Structure formats: structure tokens, C-alpha cells
UniProtKB/Swiss-Prot annotation:
Record text on activity regulation: Inhibited by bee venom neurotoxin apamin. Inhibited by d-tubocurarine and tetraethylammonium (TEA).
Self-association and partners: Homodimer. Heteromultimer with KCNN2 and KCNN3. The complex is composed of 4 channel subunits each of which binds to a calmodulin subunit which regulates the channel activity through calcium-binding. Interacts with calmodulin.
Residue numbers spanned by region Segment S6: 343-363
Similarity field: Belongs to the potassium channel KCNN family. KCa2.1/KCNN1 subfamily.
Annotated spans, Disordered: 1-90
Name of the protein described by the UniProt record: Small conductance calcium-activated potassium channel protein 1
UniProt source species: Mus musculus (Mouse)
Predominant localisation class: membrane
Pfam families, alphabetized: CaMBD, Ion_trans_2, SK_channel
Coiled-coil residues: none
Amino acid sequence: MSSHSHNGSVGQPLGSGPGFLGWEPVDPEAGRPLQPTQGPGLQMVAKGQPVRLSPGGSRGHPQEQEEEEEEEEEEDKTGSGKPPTVSHRLGHRRALFEKRKRLSDYALIFGMFGIVVMVTETELSWGVYTKESLCSFALKCLISLSTVILLGLVILYHAREIQLFLVDNGADDWRIAMTWERVSLISLELVVCAIHPVPGHYRFTWTARLAFSLVPSAAEADLDVLLSIPMFLRLYLLARVMLLHSRIFTDASSRSIGALNRVTFNTRFVTKTLMTICPGTVLLVFSVSSWIVAAWTVRVCERYHDKQEVTSNFLGAMWLISITFLSIGYGDMVPHTYCGKGVCLLTGIMGAGCTALVVAVVARKLELTKAEKHVHNFMMDTQLTKRVKNAAANVLRETWLIYKHTRLVKKPDQGRVRKHQRKFLQAIHQAQKLRSVKIEQGKVNDQANTLAELAKAQSIAYEVVSELQAQQEELEARLAALESRLDVLGASLQALPGLIAQAICPLPPPWPGPGHLATATHSPQSHWLPTMGSDCG
């Protein structure tokens, strides 16, 4: 199907040539006149953008498609006069979510890359080469480059968050989202991510007091120590990635239910969920990671003042951190510097918290479930019932034996009688004791009703009351209908005698008037016959 240009306005395709009466049609969304066609082909209009399909294929040329995509992007950036629809906003919000997730992943990758390179450079500069070497300078430049990229990714991440805020709240100005709290958090995050060992060799004098001898010690330390240890604060990016990749956070149904119940999906909620699902794994990973990081930090802090290489050795540092984490404190190893003491202090606090969590987790694992509690209580009740029955049977048996050896024999054996009397008293005391134990067991079972069971009983009672109320309302409706029917039946019964009398004794015909008499007089054929009186009167 091809289009041909003519001088007139008849036969022109849509959008080609001048319009009717010499004016050009204007695109309502783009705000510019439609472009005329430049060759044969079918032109289609979608969303105000002309797209030509050539006869040789179902699509246009790649260059034309790229130009059209660029024009659409420019229009999306400049914005049209029409407000965005709900579907457009939802699609834009979903795209922003995906971009934010990718930016968080890239930020974690570059942050971990900087930490790994920092640890490598610190270890190599201590045992292989010096800080003045070219390898150290190259590794520090690599750390600086990864830090710059990380800062850019953090800025882009917060820019996407601001865009999400604007989309969610329907705002137009990004400065509305820039509250003091958000600005402070962004500034703090940028400062944390910006700390890294800069290229070059810088030293300072580090003074400390040795642990056992209390002798002051001074050493020339590298400034990289103070700039390398804070780089572990970048591990907060791991919590952000866990939040954005959590199935609870990405599931739309979960977020909807959380929004209805006023639950905020943040890192704290995800951590609680993980502690509920797999508490042992979470505690193990956290403890081992903290152990390794703290041991390496103590090693770096103590290497300049530990002449005997006790705590500056990695295995020795791990031993010091482990006994501090478990709150044992043998005292065979102690840190010398305030840096090492601070790390040990934080390790002790984390160890106390993790120990409490371990105790709570183990106690919860060892606790019986509701079904297991019911089974255990039933078994104990059954055993107590059997023991009470056996004690009662022993009482009856000893009573019979006492009667037998005292009344049914000619010469009673007093020793045997006393023996059975002793057993009789023991059986009575045992039966009384078992009965008291059973009563106490019943009290414990009554007290074992948890709030969940009470709530369940309350819901069952509410359902029963609701059902009774519905039945009562239905019964009242039936009684009202029955009363109306009884009223109708009573009215019918009251009218029944009159209807019966009317049916048995019909009314006499009306007496003839004067006109009828004259007619009867003049009419020779009419004869009036008197009627006989009847019993009905």
C-alpha cells in the first residue's frame, strides 16, 4: 500500500503535506506541527509520534527508531502539560526501585573491594615492602579510585530515594524531601565512605604505656592505621543490600499487608525476621565475622608497641578477642594501646549481647510446643490416675487381709496382722499424697493456658454468641410472621358464622314498588302468587 502526493487535498495520507485550508496539523502532546512524509510508506500515529512502516519490512529503519527513542526521552525529561497517570507513576516507581537496588549492589561491591585492597596493602607494607614503595602507592591510588566511585554511587542512591519520595507523595520539587534529618544522614554516610588511606607516606608519634611494666613507650606509626580501621564501617552497606534483596521487602503483597498493619519494612524488621527464621545461623555468622575483624584490628593497633609479638600476632589477637568475647579474661594477654583497649571493650559488649541471645535461642529451642505440652500433661495425668487406683486397691487388699487374719482364723498371728496394718496405713498415705499431687497437676494445667489459648476461647465464645443471636433474630421473625397469620385466621373465624348463615338462608327478593304494581295490574299475563312462610323467617 503506497501513498502518492497530489496538488489537491484529496488522497493525501495522514500527516503528509499541508492540512485542510492550508494550515498544518499540530501535535497536541509535543506542541509542534506534524512532520510531512519523505517517501513512500504507511505512516501510523501513536502517542502523537509519527512512525513510518516501509513496504519492505514491518518496522522502520534502526536510525529512525533511535531518533524516535531519543525524542521520547527528551519529552519525558521536559514533561508534557498532562498530569501522569497512575500506571505511569507505578511503572516509574518500579523502575526506580530496580535502579536503587542495582546502585546498592554496586556500592557494596566497591566498598568491599576497597576494604580488601586496604587489608592487602597493610599486610604487604608491614612484611614485604615499605610505605615508600611504588606498589604501596599504586594500591592506595586504587583504594582512592574505588572510594570516589563509592561516593558517586552513594549520591546516586540517595538521588533515587528522593525521586521515590517525590513519586510516592506526588511532589514536584526535590527540595521538599531534603529535611535536616535526611541531609544529616547523607552527610554522615558520605563522611564514613570517604575515610581511606590516602596515597603517600605520613607518620606520627604514637605514645602508649606498656601493660605489665607500666613503662611509657613511643613509636613512629603510619597515619594509615587511623585511616584504615574506620573503613570497616562500610559494612553497613551489607545490611542495606540484605534489606533491598529481602523477599519480604520486594513482595508487593507483603508490603501491602505491612502498610495496612502500620509495619515499616526496614533493616530492623528484616533482622528480626531472620532471627526468628534462622537464629543460629545469624548468630554464628555475626560472631565469626566480628571475631575476625576485631582480631585484625587489635593486631594492627598493637604492632608498633608489642615487642614480643604476643598481641601483634594474628593468632594471639584471635585468642585475646575470644577470651574477651566470652567474658573469661585469663589475663595472659592484654592490649597496650588505647586503640586495642577500645576494640576489646566493644568486643566484650558484643560478647555479652551475643551470649544473652544464645541463651534465649537455646531456651526457646528446648521449650515444649503447645501440642507437646498437652501430650505431656495427658500422659502425666494418666500415670497419676493409675497410681491412685493402685493405691486404692492396696487399701482394699490390706483391709481384707487384716479382716481375714483377725476374724476368719482360729489362732490369729499378731505379727502378720501388724504387717498388714502397716501396709494398710502406707497405702492410705500414698493414696492421699497422690490425690494431692493430682490436684496440683490440675492447677498447673489450668495455669498453663496461655494468652493464645484464651484468645482462641474468646473467639469461640464470640462465634457461639453470634450464632445464638442470629438464631434468636430468626426465631423472632418467625414469631412475628406467625402472629400476623393468627390475626388473619382470627378475622376469618369471626366472619365465618355470617358467611355460613348467608349461604344457608339467602336474602328474600325485594318487594315490588308502585311501578311494578301498575305494570302487574295492566298486564293480564302476570299473576302474583303469595309465598309460603319458611322456618327461616
